[in-house]
């Protein structure tokens, strides 16, 4: 029996993941602002202004939707380790930027059409590379 290769609607998958992240954030940290969707909208508007099109535009939109894909993963791990942590005030920027490193590992499992390496990893990095992600990674 011949088995057809699995066809994945990557845009639909990214949208579903984004909605799932919204639900988890609302449940875990009571955040209901749809941050990923706003970042994606602004990113796509800027990309269109810069004449980015096709696969590159689609991949940019997906990265923007999923840029914080590991934030809730990281926060839930911290809460399990330190149950008395005040989630909104008790996590330092340096510690929360670990989600960039976790997110980079998660995102490599998605078959993008263009090179998206480092988009998730460095989304909190400063222009002078003096941010906490580079310091944490090194």
Per-region residue spans from a language model:
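Histidine- and acidic-residue-rich, metal-dependent catalytic cores
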Residues: 2-138
């Amino acid at each position: 029996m011949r088995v057809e290769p699995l066809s994945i609607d990557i845009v639909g998958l990214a949208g579903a993941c984004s909605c799932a992240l919204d639900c988890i954030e609302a449940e875990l940290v009571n955040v209901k602002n749809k941050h990923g969707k706003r970042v994606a909208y602004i990113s796509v508007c800027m990309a269109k202004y810069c004449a980015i099109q096709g696969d590159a535009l689609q991949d940019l939109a997906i990265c923007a939707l999923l840029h914080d894909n590991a934030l809730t993963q990281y926060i839930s791990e911290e809460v399990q380790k330190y149950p008395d942590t005040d989630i909104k005030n008790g996590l330092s920027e340096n510690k929360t930027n670990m989600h960039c490193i976790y997110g980079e590992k998660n995102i490599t499992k998605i078959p993008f059409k263009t090179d998206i390496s480092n988009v998730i990893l460095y989304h909190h990095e400063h222009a002078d590379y003096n941010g906490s992600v580079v310091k944490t990674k090194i």
